[in-house]
Amino acid sequence: MATSAIQHSSFAGQTTLKPSNDLLRKIGASNGGGRIIMRRTVKSTPQSIWYGPDRPKYLGPFSENTPSYLTGEYPGDYGWDTAGLSADPETFAKNRELEVIHSRWAMLGALGCTFPEILSKNGVKFGEAVWFKAGSQIFSEGGLDYLGNPNLIHAQSILAIWACQVVLMGFIEGYRIGGGPLGEGLDPLYPGGAFDPLNLAEDPEAFSELKVKELKNGRLAMFSMFGFFVQAIVTGKGPIENLFDHIADPVANNAWAYATNFVPGK
C-alpha cells in the first residue's frame, strides 16, 4: 500500500517560508525610522522526480493505471493500493501517519536488534546481546542491567517497566498528537524546532527528498523487523549470528533449507 506523510507543503512543523532578497523592503524615515516588511512565499509542489504524475511507479513502465486518489502529492507514493485501503481520504491520512510512525520505530528497532550483537562480537560485554533474549534477563536473580552495567539502569520488576512504558509513551504520543505542549499546532509528523537540530528542513526541496528517503528506509526496516521475528522463531538466533552462519555455509543456512526442515516447537 502506498502510504506516506501527512502533508505536502508544511515543513518542520509549520510552513517553511523562504524569504528572498527581493521580498525585503525597507520603508523610509517617514515611517518612523524605517521598518522592515517581509513577504514570504511558499512552494506548494516539490520539484522532484518522486512527486507528481510522472513519478516512479511500483512496476515501472509495466504499472497499470494508478488509483485516482494516488496523485503523487505525498512522499512514498508509488501508485500501489490494489486493495483500495486508502480510497477514503480520512483513512488515507491515517494510514500515511501510521506508516511514518511505524517506519521510525522499525528503523530504531532494527538498529537495536543488530548493534548489540555487533558490539558483543567485537569484545564489548553484555549480559545478553541477542535482542529477543535480552528482555528475559529481568526475570533472572540479579535482574537486568542495561549494557551489562549495574550503575546505569538496574531493572528488577517487569511491572515497573510496563508502567513506565505506558506513562512515558502516553505522554509522548499525547504531546505529538496535541501539537506540542500548549496545543501550538505543531505538525504531528514533522514538528521541527528542537526536533530538527540539524535544520534538515530548512530547504523545502531537500526536505521533500528526505521525506521520501525516510519512508523508503522505513519500509525496508519494517520488512527487516519481520525477518528478525521469523529468524528468532525458526533458528533461535540473532540476525548477526544468522548472517555469519549463512556466510560460512550458504547452502545449509538459508531460508529454503530452514523452511523445509522447520518443525514448530523443536
UniProtKB/Swiss-Prot annotation:
Chlorophyll b 2 binds at R104, I153, L182. Chlorophyll b 4 binds at Q165, R176. Chlorophyll a 2 binds at H102. Keywords: Chlorophyll, Chloroplast, Chromophore, Magnesium, Membrane, Metal-binding, Phosphoprotein, Photosynthesis, Photosystem I, Photosystem II, Plastid, Thylakoid, Transit peptide, Transmembrane, Transmembrane helix. The chain crosses the membrane at residues 152-172, 220-240. Its main location: plastid. The modification Phosphothreonine is found at T41. Chlorophyll a 1 binds at W80, S86, E99, R219. Chlorophyll a 5 binds at K213, Q231. Coiled coil: none annotated. Binds at least 14 chlorophylls (8 Chl-a and 6 Chl-b) and carotenoids such as lutein and neoxanthin. Chlorophyll a 6 binds at H246, A255. GO terms for molecular function: chlorophyll binding; metal ion binding; mRNA binding. GO terms for cellular component: chloroplast envelope; chloroplast thylakoid membrane; cytosol; photosystem I; photosystem II; PSII associated light-harvesting complex II; thylakoid. Pfam families: Chloroa_b-bind. Disruption phenotype: In plants silenced with microRNAs, functional LHCII thylakoid protein complexes where LHCB2 is replaced by LHCB1. However these LHCII complexes are impaired in light state transitions, leading to stunted growth in high light. Belongs to the light-harvesting chlorophyll a/b-binding (LHC) protein family. This is Chlorophyll a-b binding protein 2.4, chloroplastic.
